[in-house]
């Protein structure tokens, strides 16, 4: 079983989402199976070398971070590694001979009709570790009570949990982004919907992507189109997956994720001035503030952009796309399975500290034979 270490990817992803880096190319080909600084002060503790001795009151930043990525977590298991997805083709229809009887004709009932069954296997994991060391004796001089010391240690553990949450959020988004990139790269008919081009062709307007989210008429058209495709993928079709497989996705199994700027624009420019809001809005969706990162300015071109390297047969291909407003997919199209968070502890008796190794591994997968649609706004090339 292939297990990929992703320390560098996880660390660079944090810079993309906290505004300290532009949106950079991410290689997902091995991830998704398809105040003031304290300086020059001698009165500091001997543990983290940052805490001032004998402070009257210390306030700890112990705020727990709540993740915002869409939930695509599947079940977990202890033994075995491979995920197997089994499917079968639709059987062909034959004539009903009960209503076509002829004198003296033989009707053969002993024909074997073999089911056309297919299976896909997913057998790769990613893994990372967040280590942090703790001590008590060496840092006691920085606090006035055991309560303060425990609050400090609690803050450190919360920081570890927050780091895990933000990085797992990023990995979930990478799972979605990898599928999005696969669809954009394949450029197959009804899997990639340029809402802006459709709107301009339908209305005769010449709207640009820069103005689209402030145009109520466009937003109404976009909501109409998205709702139409939700009805369409509920019916059996081969048009909405890369494998050309007969698939249908009932509303209960649909997962719609939209850019929060688009969702907010719909509420402000459209729903706020509409009496019958249910007739014009999209519903039952998750929203995300960006797909891959914020850039340094949180501009639309950054938050609506993906720049990833994906598997393309035996090679990798870079896919760059801006203007992505949303994705609609079957709940079986992608997910996170066999997740295994755990903590191991090592005690160093000589130096009197202990280290927690917070480990996580899981399977991140895309099934390109499931329904997946990308909605975007892209200006026509000049």
Indicate where each model-derived feature is located.
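Alpha-helix boundary/N-cap detector
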Residues: 1-5, 35-50, 147, 151, ...
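Loop-centered beta-sheet repeat module
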Residues: 159, 170-224
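Extended, compositionally biased alpha-helical segments that mediate assembly or anchoring
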Residues: 1-65, 277-382
């Amino acid at each position: 079983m292939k297990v990929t270490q992703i320390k560098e990817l996880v660390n660079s992803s944090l810079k993309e989402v906290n505004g300290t880096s532009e949106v950079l190319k991410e290689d997902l080909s091995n991830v998704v199976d398809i105040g003031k600084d304290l300086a020059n002060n001698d009165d500091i503790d001997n543990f983290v070398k940052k805490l001032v001795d004998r402070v009257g009151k210390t306030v700890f930043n112990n705020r727990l971070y709540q993740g915002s990525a869409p939930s695509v977590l599947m079940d977990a298991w202890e033994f075995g590694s491979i995920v197997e997805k089994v499917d079968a083709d639709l059987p062909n229809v034959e004539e009903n001979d009960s209503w076509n009887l002829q004198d003296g004709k033989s009707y053969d009932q002993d024909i074997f009709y073999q089911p056309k069954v297919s299976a896909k296997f997913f057998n790769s994991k990613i893994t990372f570790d967040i280590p942090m060391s703790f001590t008590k004796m060496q840092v006691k001089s920085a606090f006035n009570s055991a309560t303060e010391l425990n609050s400090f240690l609690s803050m450190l553990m919360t920081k570890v949990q927050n780091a895990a949450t933000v990085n797992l959020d990023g990995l979930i988004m990478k799972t979605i982004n990898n599928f999005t990139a696969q669809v954009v790269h394949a450029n197959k008919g009804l899997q990639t919907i340029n809402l802006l081009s459709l709107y301009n062709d339908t209305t005769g307007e010449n709207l640009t992507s820069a103005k689209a989210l402030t145009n109520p008429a466009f937003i109404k058209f976009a909501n109409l189109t998205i709702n139409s495709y939700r009805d369409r993928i509920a019916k059996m079709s081969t048009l909405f997956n890369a494998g050309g497989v007969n698939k249908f996705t009932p509303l209960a199994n649909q997962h719609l994720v939209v850019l929060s700027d688009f969702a907010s624009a719909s509420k402000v420019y459209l729903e706020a001035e509409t009496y019958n809001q249910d007739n014009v809005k999209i519903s039952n969706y998750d929203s995300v503030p960006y797909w891959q990162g914020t850039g340094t300015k949180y501009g639309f071109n950054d938050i609506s952009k993906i720049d990833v390297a994906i598997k393309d047969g035996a090679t990798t291909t870079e896919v760059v796309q801006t203007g992505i407003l949303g994705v609609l997919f079957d709940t079986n199209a992608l997910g996170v399975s066999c997740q295994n968070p755990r903590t191991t502890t090592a005690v160093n008796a000589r130096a009197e500290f202990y280290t927690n190794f917070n480990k996580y591994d899981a399977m991140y997968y895309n099934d390109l034979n499931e329904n997946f649609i990308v909605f975007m706004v892209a200006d026509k090339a000049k």
